[in-house]
């Protein structure tokens, strides 16, 4: 396995993290993500049915705490994985940053890679607040949560190429997104342009995901040992990112462009 020499400073908890046990656990338990997804789907439909005849819950303080916790986690994750990826990109080049498997077991990043995939299970809790507060639940929201959980657990066990980019981008977008949610939940007035920026960042993330999949597919065929993945993973990843791209573009149009056109016609 290709290990990159890294000179970035490690914190003690990052040094003590046993990535071999983590990878082995995921190889043995990744299919539990299907169980979590099924329970999540059952909660969505069951919870909405139960809340039909009930008054909504405010849950403002718990929502602030929840969003703030995920924001802080994502900020730290983005800083640590971002530092690693930047180091590899500048010292080894683009191909190594995409193909290097040491993101999963190297210093600094190994802890945050595992923390990332595990976090996709508790992040399902976002939907609890939407259900209990009787807010609009769109398809993109729960589809995104389920598929990210399934794909993250499925991919981590194989340590496939491209994972470093996928995780770092997601950390970065979530750092901004959950900070925005925390501010909104706390009652701060946040510019509409900030929300537009977040959605554009998500669209950019999905475009980059498609590009990374193309690069992995291309490099894998020339040297699978140096850029390890498999066609099944690339197929599911490409399908996932393409579907996200379409859905986020549709959401952007409906939420920002479509509303402006309707408001203009009304005037």
Curated annotation (Swiss-Prot):
Disulfide feature: none
Pfam families (UniProt xref): ELO (PF01151)
Subcellular localization: Endoplasmic reticulum membrane
Principal subcellular localisation of the protein: endoplasmic reticulum
Top-rank taxon: Eukaryota
Chain segments annotated as coiled-coil in the UniProt record: none
pH dependence per the UniProt record: Optimum pH is 6.5 at 37 degrees Celsius with hexadecanoyl-CoA as substrate.
Annotated knockout phenotype: Homozygous knockout mice lacking Elovl6 are partially viable and surviving animals are fertile. Mutant mice appear grossly normal and slightly but significantly leaner than wild-type littermates. Hepatic concentrations of stearate (C18:0) and oleate (C18:1n-9) are lowered, whereas those of palmitate (C16:0) and palmitoleate (C16:1n7) are increased. Elovl6 deletion abrogates the development of diet-induced insulin resistance.
Keyword terms, alphabetized: Endoplasmic reticulum, Fatty acid biosynthesis, Fatty acid metabolism, Glycoprotein, Lipid biosynthesis, Lipid metabolism, Membrane, Transferase, Transmembrane, Transmembrane helix
Membrane topology type: Multi-pass membrane protein
Enzyme class name: transferase
Catalytic activity entry: a very-long-chain acyl-CoA + malonyl-CoA + H(+) = a very-long-chain 3-oxoacyl-CoA + CO2 + CoA; hexadecanoyl-CoA + malonyl-CoA + H(+) = 3-oxooctadecanoyl-CoA + CO2 + CoA; (9Z)-hexadecenoyl-CoA + malonyl-CoA + H(+) = 3-oxo-(11Z)-octadecenoyl-CoA + CO2 + CoA; dodecanoyl-CoA + malonyl-CoA + H(+) = 3-oxotetradecanoyl-CoA + CO2 + CoA
An example Gene Ontology biological process: long-chain fatty-acyl-CoA biosynthetic process
Any one cellular-component term (Gene Ontology): fatty acid elongase complex
GO molecular function, one term: acyltransferase activity, transferring groups other than amino-acyl groups
Tissues in which the UniProt entry reports expression: Highly expressed in adrenal gland, liver, white adipose tissue (WAT), adult and fetal brain, cerebellum, spinal cord, testis, skin and peripheral nerve; where lipogenesis and steroidogenesis are active. Weakly expressed in kidney, heart, skeletal muscle, lung, and spleen.
Annotated glycan sites: 2
Pathway: Lipid metabolism; fatty acid biosynthesis
EC number: 2.3.1.199
Regulation of catalytic or functional activity: The reaction is stimulated by the presence of HSD17B12, the enzyme catalyzing the second step of the elongation cycle.
Modification(s) after translation: N-Glycosylated.
TM ranges: 34-51, 70-90, 111-131, 136-156, 159-179, 197-217, 234-254
Family classification: Belongs to the ELO family. ELOVL6 subfamily.
UniProt-recorded name of the protein: Very long chain fatty acid elongase 6
Name of the gene: Elovl6
């Amino acid at each position: 396995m290709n290990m990159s020499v890294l000179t970035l400073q490690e914190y003690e908890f990052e040094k003590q993290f046993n990535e071999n046990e983590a990878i082995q656990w995921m190889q043995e338990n990744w299919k539990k993500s299907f169980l979590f997804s099924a329970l999540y789907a059952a909660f969505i439909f069951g919870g909405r049915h139960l809340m039909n005849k009930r008054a909504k819950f405010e849950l403002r303080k718990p929502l602030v705490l929840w969003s703030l916790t995920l924001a802080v986690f994502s900020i730290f994750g983005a800083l640590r994985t971002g530092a690693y990826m930047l180091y590899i990109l500048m010292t080894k080049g683009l191909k190594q940053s995409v193909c290097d498997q040491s993101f999963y077991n190297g210093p600094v990043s190994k802890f945050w890679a595992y923390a990332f995939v595990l976090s996709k299970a508790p992040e399902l809790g976002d939907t609890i607040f939407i259900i209990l507060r009787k807010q609009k639940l769109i398809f993109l929201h729960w589809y995104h949560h389920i598929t990210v959980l399934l794909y993250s657990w499925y991919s981590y066990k194989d340590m496939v190429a491209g994972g470093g980019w996928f995780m770092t981008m997601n950390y970065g977008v979530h750092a901004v997104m959950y900070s925005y949610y925390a501010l909104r939940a706390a009652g701060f007035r946040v510019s509409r342009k900030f929300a537009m920026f977040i959605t554009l960042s998500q669209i950019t993330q999905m475009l980059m995901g498609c590009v990374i999949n193309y690069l992995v597919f291309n490099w894998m065929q020339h040297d699978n040992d140096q850029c390890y993945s498999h066609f099944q993973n690339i197929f599911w990843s490409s399908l996932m990112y393409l579907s996200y791209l379409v859905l986020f573009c549709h959401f952007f149009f409906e939420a920002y462009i479509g509303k402006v056109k309707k408001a203009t016609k009304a005037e």
